[in-house]
């Protein structure tokens, strides 16, 4: 159940299993529905993740000049786009044309056209997230190096819906910050309600364009899907820090990103 009891533009609240957990609320930016700050989350040692360090987002397609200014005023100077080349060629990211912003493309899985699906849709996205952790580890490592190089700015990372590739990235960042898994799962779950209208339109578009009947699980953000990724991360690597070290991210870069997340 979603209950917004905050006057903040950024932080809302989610009640999950009778436990109140703060969850980021979308910024008021036109044409995006899931641009959210990773700040404001409690860590296991009692700290709070910093605001204006990281924004997770869906694609800001057709964004207006006013909302570009909103993002610049928010501090965004680095954008990491996780979409495939096919997606980028089909719909370029308008933020790449802003002179003040450093734009990076780190292609990861395209859930609608990628050969990684072998011509079929997955039963659930949890298996896709595990695949991302295994097969996109190098690009995840590159992304955290980019973040470390932009330590004094707000870093925005996006895919198309801001759910899957962006969700795994957010999971790694929050895990690195020391945020507990329950809070990470709540942050993930919010996407489905934020993007519901968009997802319904995408289902129709994919059917018409590719002739694919997309299962509901592809558009859902049920907690068990990200839980699968967290469980796999912990079993194989232990935590996000060990995962990033295995991805050839330097200890110094990890230290910097941690300092961006928490004091």
What is the meaning of each model-derived region?
Residues 2-156, 168-263:
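Cys-dependent protein tyrosine phosphatase-like superfamily
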Residues 161, 165-166:
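Ser/Thr-glycine-rich phosphate-binding loops at phosphate-binding pockets of nucleotides
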């Amino acid at each position: 159940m979603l209950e917004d009891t905050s006057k903040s533009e950024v932080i809302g609240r989610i009640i999950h299993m009778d436990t109140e957990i703060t969850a980021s609320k979308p910024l008021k930016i036109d044409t995006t529905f899931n641009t959210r700050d990773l700040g404001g989350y409690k860590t296991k040692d009692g700290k709070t993740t910093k605001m204006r360090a990281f924004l997770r987002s869906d694609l800001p397609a057709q964004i207006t000049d006013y909302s570009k200014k909103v993002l610049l005023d928010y501090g965004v100077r680095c954008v990491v786009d996780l979409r495939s080349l096919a997606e980028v060629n089909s719909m370029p990211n308008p933020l790449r044309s802003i002179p003040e912003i450093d734009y990076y493309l780190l292609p990861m899985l395209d859930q609608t056209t990628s050969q990684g699906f072998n011509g079929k849709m997955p039963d659930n996205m949890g298996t896709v997230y595990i695949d991302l952790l295994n097969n996109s580890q190098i690009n995840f490592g590159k992304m955290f190096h980019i973040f470390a190089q932009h330590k004094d700015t707000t870093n925005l990372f996006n895919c198309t819906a801001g759910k899957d590739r962006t969700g795994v990235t957010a999971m790694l960042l929050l895990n690195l910050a020391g945020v507990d898994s329950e809070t990470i799962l709540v942050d993930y779950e919010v996407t489905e309600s934020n993007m519901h209208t968009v997802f319904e339109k995408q289902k129709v578009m994919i059917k018409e364009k590719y002739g694919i009947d997309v299962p509901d699980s592809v558009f859902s953000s049920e907690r068990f899907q990200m839980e699968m990724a967290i469980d796999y991360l912990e079993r194989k690597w232990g935590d996000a820090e060990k995962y990033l070290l295995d991805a050839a991210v330097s200890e110094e870069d990890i230290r910097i990103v941690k300092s961006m997340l928490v004091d």
